[in-house]
Amino acid sequence: MASIAASASISLQARPRQLAIAASQVKSFSNGRRSSLSFNLRQLPTRLTVSCAAKPETVDKVCAVVRKQLSLKEADEITAATKFAALGADSLDTVEIVMGLEEEFGIEMAEEKAQSIATVEQAAALIEELLFEKAK
């Protein structure tokens, strides 16, 4: 009966610790009632992702401001990954945290940027970005 052949290229991006694979020369054959699909696989180089973490000193200062603004005890653990909401902060508390950070670091945060922070790490990264821009 009829035979069909096609060629295509498919690329899958790798996640951490996984391989990227490309499928090329995809072929489909039909022989009466049975059909089969075959393709060749080859490994692609993995893509690197660069992420930048805030300086530990900045994170520590942010933690201190958050602790002060929310009246938290020293026993209450605050890390870079801590979400303000997990500490019981509502939207008003978050505004007060931002105001405290602006005062502590001598910066001004745009409202849309301030609304995007939800964790200590995000706040510290934004502060470092603003300090870098201010130093230019």
UniProtKB/Swiss-Prot annotation:
The lineage of its organism: Eukaryota, Viridiplantae, Streptophyta, Embryophyta, Tracheophyta. Belongs to the acyl carrier protein (ACP) family. GO terms for cellular component: chloroplast. This is Acyl carrier protein 2, chloroplastic. The gene is ACP2. It comes from Arabidopsis thaliana. It is found in: Plastid, Chloroplast. Residues 56-131 form the Carrier domain. 4'-phosphopantetheine is transferred from CoA to a specific serine of apo-ACP by acpS. This modification is essential for activity because fatty acids are bound in thioester linkage to the sulfhydryl of the prosthetic group. One of its GO terms (molecular function) is phosphopantetheine binding. Keywords: Chloroplast, Fatty acid biosynthesis, Fatty acid metabolism, Lipid biosynthesis, Lipid metabolism, Phosphopantetheine, Phosphoprotein, Plastid, Transit peptide.
